[in-house]
Amino acid sequence: MAAAVAELWETLKQAIVAYTGLSPAAFFTAVAAAAALYHVVSGIFAGPPPPPPPRPRDEPEAEPLPPPVQLGEVSEEELRQYDGSDPKKPLLMAIKGQIYDVTQSRMFYGPGGPYALFAGKDASRALAKMSFEPQDLTGDISGLGPFELDALQDWEYKFMGKYVKVGTVKKTVPVEDGAPSTSPETTETAAAAEPEKAPATEEKPREVSSEEVKEKEDAVAAAAPDEGAKES
């Protein structure tokens, strides 16, 4: 094999000398210089790169996000309306009773996102425990350990720095067993419905006329002589 390669190389050198009159070294140097010159010249006279392909007309452009709307104090039931199921409404989520607009992160908290279960809810307990269980999708953080509370604090700092606060979750006061759950308005209504008791009337003394007094005096005077006769 080596002998065949050496024989081929000798034949090539003889052909170069016979046809070009140059030595093999000079011939290959000239070929390399010609290739380099071609590369430089083609780079100078080459046209500009082609423009990028035009954007398809049927591809919709991303609409700008609407500005956050302040909701004030809302109930948990009202907060569920902003879970991303209605694309016309903002995407909201609450931590420790504070509601934030997370519309800009719809890919995470919107339908189909990894944290879609947290949208429209106060997910404080779930975030602290990094749980996706339904019973943890609540704002009740009682019984959490120090590490879980620290994790929840980190989430709150992240939301405060990235999202706009738009409201708070209305707190519900539980009714104790056996205690009446009447509101002040109900008490006032019941008091107004009771009939008013008429005050007891005092009997006024009957007025005695002068004729009645005179008749009594005459009767006493007539009875006086009879009593004197009985005594004698």
Curated annotation (Swiss-Prot):
Region listing for Disordered, in residue ranges: 48-77, 172-232
Organism this protein belongs to: Oryza sativa subsp. japonica
Name used for this protein in its record: Membrane steroid-binding protein 1
Compartments reported by the entry: Cell membrane
Biased composition (Low complexity): 179-193
Signal peptide: none
Gene Ontology terms for molecular function: steroid binding
Role summary: Binds multiple steroid compounds. May act as a coreceptor with SERL2 and enhance its endocytosis.
Keywords annotated in UniProt: Cell membrane, Lipid-binding, Membrane, Signal-anchor, Steroid-binding, Transmembrane, Transmembrane helix
Region (Steroid-binding): 73-170
